[in-house]
Amino acid sequence: FFKQKTAYDIRLSLVGSEMCIRDRLYDGIVSSRDVGKQQELPPTLANTVIHGDSRNLEIPDNCVHLVVTSPPYNASKAYDEDLSLSEYLEMLYNVFAECYRVLAPGGRMVVNVANLGRKPYIPLSSHINLMMNQLGFLMRGEIIWDKSASAGSSCAWGSFQSASNPCLRDVHEYLLVFSKGNYKLLREKSEREEGRIDTIPRDDFIQHTKSIWSFATERASRVNHPAPFPVELPKRCIEMYSFAGDVVLDPFNGSGTTCVAAKNTGRAYIGVDLSEEYCAIARKRLEETESWICLLY
């Protein structure tokens, strides 16, 4: 009996220590902050594609509910400048600072990013996580986009079937998810009655709250863009992290995939891009996109 009791006491002590350590991990980490009050989006900005620089968004503070974006990878794509890593990260910082400014309290931001290179390997996702923390964002989690269904059979550069220098084949990207000010996106009863409702089906919610998503990539030729993501990606983010009638922003709009998904799901959209050519492509795609009835705009 004495030995059993001692072992039991030890187990209790270990459990208590683990809980104490786990609690201390969160010391100093903010879970909410005052970021002001939500503002109304000017109606003239709703459902627009803007040719402009997202480092200086002409959008009022605290009026966007969700940002979904995939920054250009700075990987010799025709639309991208040839920036050093520090210059690229500075550019992202300035754009994301503007996104933080325009997001409403409780608003969310989803950044789709792939890590780059092999020799050396550049962990862009890690850089962005640190950057977002510095800007004041609250991190909600990470989703892995499994692209293996679209992967070819060729090997990555490196030694074949040898320990000399095997290289990993990248078949995934990250979706980094953040909130501004609070983890909860507020909604008044009157707003729900006026149509600011959830649109995600039950089965989709159960599947999409898992941290791994699997679906194929988009063909670049289909949307006239060198690095497109499929509509399914922003659609899932929009339905999970916003209500019908909410405002969705993409500061790296490209060919307009996020805006297309927003229009399909009954949200208002704003797309901003430096390229006049891609703005024209996005507008054309949106003209050809069916609109889900949006009750608030």
Identify what each model region corresponds to.
Residues 17, 22-281, 287-288, 294-297:
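Core catalytic lobe of class I
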Residues 1-21:
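Single conserved hydrophobic/aromatic residue that forms the stacking wall/gate
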